C-alpha cells in the first residue's frame, strides 16, 4: 500500500492505513522562556498545560540548559553574559526535582488520546546565548571512579560558521537538538527528568536535529508535551554526563497519528529509520532496539521475522545513545537507501 508522504518520508507505525487528525487551519505559536512556562526536573500529568494546539500546528519553544545558572557558574560564565530570561527562571522557579532539567511546557495537543502517537517534526534551532558548557561532577558519568572532582568548560560558538571552539586547535561542529522531549505518563507523582522511558523524555539522541522526526507514544489526553535539555552537540554515549549544554529556541511541528500505538519512541532522519531500546542494562537496551527494528521491518516492509533479524545483522548499526542517565539507551539505525 502506498503511504502518505510528507516533507519527510513518514516512519509509519502500523500496517493499517494512515489516519490523520484534523490539520485544518494550522497555526504558529511561540512559547517564551519565563517562569510560568517552566517545570523543573520532572514530567507529570498534574502540570497544567501552558498552551493548547491543534494537530498540524507549529510551535517555537524557548528552553533553558540543564542545571541552570549554577551550571554556567561552574564553567566560569560571567553574570553579564547570562540572558535575563535565564536569570529570572532560575530565581523564580524554586520547586524543583527530582531531576536537573528545566523543561518548557507542557503543551496540550487537541485530539491526542492514549493509544495514539505524537509525531514531532524538528524544524530548526536557534541559540539563546552563543556558548555552551560541558564537564562532569564527582562519581558520575561512564567513569565514576576515575575523576573524583568536578570540572566544567566554557565552549564558545561561531553560529555563522556552525562551529564551536573546544580549545586551541580543536574545533567542534555544531549540531543542536533537544536532549529531552517527552509526554506525561498516566501515573501519579513526578517522573524524574533524568532517566528516559515510556514517556520518551531524556533520550539524548544526537540524531534529532533539524529535519528529523520523533514519534512519541501518547499516555494521557492531550499528550502534555514538554522539552528542554538543549545540546549544541554530543557524542554517542555522552560519557562524561554532559553534552555541549546550552539554551535553545526550537521550532517543531506537531501532528497526531490516530490509533497508531507504539510501545517505545521511534524516530527518522532523511536517511535512516531509528528504533530505540531503553533499559538500565545495556545488553537489554540493545535487545529492545533490535526487537523494535524487527517489528518495524515486519509490519512496514513486509519482511518475514527471521529474515528481518538477519537483515539487521548485516545492514543495521546499533549505537550507544547514552550510558549516563541511569536508564541506558541504544538506538538502531536502518538506512532508507536499502529500499527501492
Residue ranges and their predicted role:
Residues 32-96:
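N-terminal, Lys/Arg-enriched amphipathic/low-complexity engagement segments
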Residues 66-78, 125-135, 222-232, 322-324:
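Short, Lys/Arg- and Gly-enriched loop/turn segments at beta-strand edges
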Residues 9-21:
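Bacterial N-terminal signal peptides
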Residues 176-282:
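Conserved mixed alpha/beta catalytic, RNA-binding, or beta-rich assembly cores of soluble enzyme
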Residues 34-44, 96-104, 191-199:
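Short, structured beta-strand/loop micro-motifs enriched in basic residues and often containing a Trp
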Residues 61, 117-120, 216:
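A generic structural signal for residues embedded in beta-strands
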Residues 101-102, 108, 123-209:
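Intrinsically disordered, low-complexity linker/loop segments enriched in Gly/Pro
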Amino acid at each position: 500500500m502506498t503511504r502518505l508522504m510528507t516533507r519527510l518520508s513518514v516512519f509509519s507505525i502500523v500496517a493499517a492505513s494512515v489516519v490523520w487528525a484534523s490539520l485544518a487551519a494550522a497555526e504558529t505559536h511561540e512559547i517564551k522562556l519565563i517562569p510560568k512556562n517552566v517545570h523543573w526536573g520532572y514530567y507529570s500529568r498534574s502540570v497544567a498545560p501552558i498552551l493548547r494546539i491543534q494537530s498540524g500546528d507549529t510551535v517555537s519553544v524557548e528552553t533553558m540548559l540543564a542545571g541552570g545558572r549554577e551550571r554556567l557558574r561552574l564553567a566560569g560564565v560571567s553574570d553579564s553574559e547570562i540572558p535575563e530570561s535565564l536569570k529570572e527562571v532560575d530565581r523564580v522557579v524554586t520547586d524543583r526535582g527530582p531531576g536537573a532539567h528545566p523543561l518548557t511546557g507542557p503543551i496540550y495537543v487537541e485530539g491526542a488520546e492514549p493509544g495514539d502517537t505524537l509525531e514531532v517534526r524538528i524544524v530548526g534551532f536557534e541559540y539563546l546565548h552563543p556558548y555552551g558548557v560541558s564537564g562532569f561532577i564527582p562519581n558520575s558519568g561512564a567513569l565514576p571512579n576515575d575523576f573524583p572532582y568536578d570540572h566544567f568548560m566554557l565552549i564558545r560558538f561561531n553560529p555563522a560558521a556552525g562551529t564551536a571552539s573546544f580549545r586551541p586547535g580543536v574545533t567542534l561542529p555544531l549540531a543542536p537538538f533537544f536532549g529531552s522531549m517527552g509526554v506525561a505518563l498516566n501515573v501519579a507523582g513526578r517522573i524524574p527528568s533524568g532517566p528516559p522511558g515510556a514517556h520518551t523524555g531524556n533520550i539524548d539522541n544526537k540524531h534529532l536535529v533539524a529535519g528529523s522526526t520523533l514519534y512519541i507514544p501518547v499516555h494521557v489526553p492531550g499528550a502534555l508535551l514538554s522539552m528542554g535539555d538543549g545540546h549544541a552537540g554530543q557524542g554517542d554515549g555522552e560519557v562524561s554526563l554532559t553534552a555541549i549544554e546550552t539554551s535553545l529556541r526550537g521550532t517543531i511541528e506537531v501532528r497526531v497519528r490516530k490509533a497508531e500505538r507504539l510501545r517505545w519512541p521511534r524516530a527518522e532522519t532523511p536517511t535512516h529509520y531509528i528504533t530505540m531500546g531503553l533499559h538500565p542494562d545495556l545488553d537489554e537496551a540493545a535487545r529492545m532496539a533490535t526487537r523494535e527494528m524487527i517489528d518495524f521491518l515486519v509490519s512496514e516492509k513486509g519482511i518475514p521475522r527471521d529474515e528481518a533479524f538477519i537483515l539487521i545483522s548485516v545492514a543495521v548499526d546499533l549505537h550507544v545513545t547514552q550510558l549516563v542517565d541511569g536508564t541506558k539507551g541504544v538506538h538502531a539505525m536502518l538506512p532508507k537507501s536499502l529500499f527501492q
